[in-house]
Structures are given as structure tokens and as C-alpha cells.
A protein has these predicted regions:
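Helix-to-loop junction immediately C-terminal to a conserved catalytic motif
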Residues: 65
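Conserved ABC ATPase "signature" region
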Residues: 125-157, 205
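Conserved catalytic motifs of ABC-family nucleotide-binding domains
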Residues: 182
Length: 265
């Protein structure tokens, strides 16, 4: 193929949004949670979805993760419109997530917790169907899991029981479990929640470094926490996007200031 044509195809691929959700509406028992919400995540960027409590952030996160079925709206991945994903389709698409509640098995070791993530990934068919059924595969599964732990600087915790970890360490392990599938998109629900300033600084630096390999979507309540790490922000209030754009512009938007001061949207 002509090198110029190849370069054009690669450029088009890069410019195509990795993930798009458009005109998303969700209601629960007649109560509107989201109305006409849109979101776009590009390749190798960090996008934050922020807003006051009850703004609809987690509902949007759950819709993309297959935990909530929207009443209306479209979902596209790599430029192709698809049906809204189910939770068991996320790994196949290349999406991994961590939830606010972390969700580690307390009586298992850290390594065992991450290996569970690898086993779930194997069941998608993206790894050999026989993966994990013999000693060789189990060793590979363990290696993959240890690599994920080392990426979050938690390799030394591998043999610790999950219920003995500090809260910041449980956050790291939960991210390692998501990274074991080597996703294109990592979705993080309140990654800085409950962390002190030093741990937040570490988390933001770590997330920033991930963008050489993937895109990251963060749902967060506190705007200041994500300002330094996000390329772009979407601000929700009362189930609608009230502002979006680069972080500095969003921070100065009067609608955003009003929403966070509680004086209305």
C-alpha cells in the first residue's frame, strides 16, 4: 500500500473517537436520572465526568458498563454504533472498570484476587478457551496477574490477604485486577475517594502515565481532584451536561461554579 494512503488511514483511525455515548436518557420509576447526555472519549486521553451528588455521574458510568439499560441513546465504540454493552461483553470490547466499592474478596490473597480478573478475561475467548486448565496455563495466568500488580507498584503485596490491606492499597489492587485484561478503556469510579493528598497525587500521576497505552474515563465528585489529570471534563447536574471542554475552561464556567456552590445550574 502507498505509504501516504497508509498514513491517512492511521490518522483517520486516531481521529475517530474511541467511545461515544449520545443523547443518553435514563429514568428510574418515572424519575429522570439522565436526559440527553453525551460523552466522547478519544484515544490516549483522560476524560473526567464530574458533578455534585445526585448529578447522574454514576448512572452514566453504569450505563456504559452494562449495569443500567438506557431508555434511549446510542453507544459507539471505535467508530461503530453498537447495542449498549452487557457487563459480560466489556472485556471483549476492550473496556475494564473499577467500582467505587472496590469489591475485593477479603479472605483471598491479593494475587488470587487479581487472578480472578484474569480468569474472567479468559472466559471471553480472547485467551485460549483452555486457558487456566493446566499447570502451564495457571503459571501464565499468575505471570499476567503479577505483571498487573507490578504496574501499580503492588507486587510486594501479592501474598497478603485482601482484608489486611490499607484502603489506598485496596484501590491499587482493584486497578491491577482491571488492567490484567489489557483494556483500551479503563473506567474508574471515584478513584480518589477516601484517599489522602499524597495518595491522590500518586493516583493522578499513575493515571496520566496509562495514556500511552489506553484511554481513561473517570467519574469523580470533587473537581479539584481531577483537574490536574484530565484532558477534558464533562460536568453533570440534575442529569444533564451543563458544561464540557478542557479543564481550565470548565472550571471558570459560571454554570459549573453555581452548581458546586449549590445556587442552581
Amino acid at each position: 500500500m502507498d505509504p501516504v494512503c497508509l498514513e491517512s488511514i492511521q490518522l483517520m483511525s486516531t481521529n475517530t473517537p474511541l467511545l461515544q455515548a449520545e443523547r443518553v436518557s435514563v429514568s428510574f420509576g418515572g424519575l429522570r436520572a439522565l436526559h440527553d447526555v453525551y460523552l466522547q472519549l478519544n484515544h490516549n486521553e483522560v476524560v473526567g465526568v464530574i458533578g455534585p451528588n445526585g448529578a447522574g455521574k454514576t448512572t452514566l458510568f453504569n450505563a456504559i458498563c452494562g449495569l443500567v439499560t438506557p431508555d434511549s441513546g446510542t453507544f459507539s465504540f471505535e467508530g461503530k454504533q453498537r447495542s449498549w454493552p452487557r457487563t459480560d461483553q466489556l472485556a471483549e470490547l476492550g473496556i475494564a472498570r473499577t467500582l467505587q466499592g472496590v469489591g475485593l474478596f477479603p479472605d483471598l490473597t491479593v494475587l488470587e484476587n487479581v487472578m480472578i480478573g484474569a480468569q474472567k478475561f479468559a472466559k471471553t475467548g480472547l485467551i485460549s478457551a483452555s486457558f487456566g486448565r493446566n499447570t502451564k496455563d495457571e503459571a501464565e495466568l499468575m505471570d499476567r496477574s503479577m505483571t498487573a500488580l507490578e504496574r501499580v507498584y503492588a507486587g510486594a503485596l501479592a501474598n497478603r490477604r485482601a482484608n489486611t490491606l490499607s484502603y489506598p492499597d485496596t484501590k491499587r489492587v482493584a486497578i491491577a485486577r482491571a488492567l490484567v485484561s489489557e483494556p483500551q478503556v479503563l473506567m474508574l469510579d471515584e478513584p480518589a475517594g477516601g484517599l489522602g493528598p499524597q495518595d491522590i497525587e500518586w493516583m493522578n500521576g499513575f493515571i496520566r502515565n496509562l495514556t500511552s497505552h489506553m484511554s481513561v474515563l473517570i467519574v469523580e465528585h470533587h473537581m479539584d481532584v481531577v483537574m490536574s489529570v484530565c484532558d477534558r471534563l464533562y460536568v453533570l447536574n440534575f442529569g444533564e451536561v451543563i458544561s464540557s471542554g478542557v479543564s481550565d475552561d470548565v472550571r471558570r464556567d459560571p454554570a459549573v461554579i453555581a452548581a458546586y456552590l449549590g445556587t442552581g445550574a
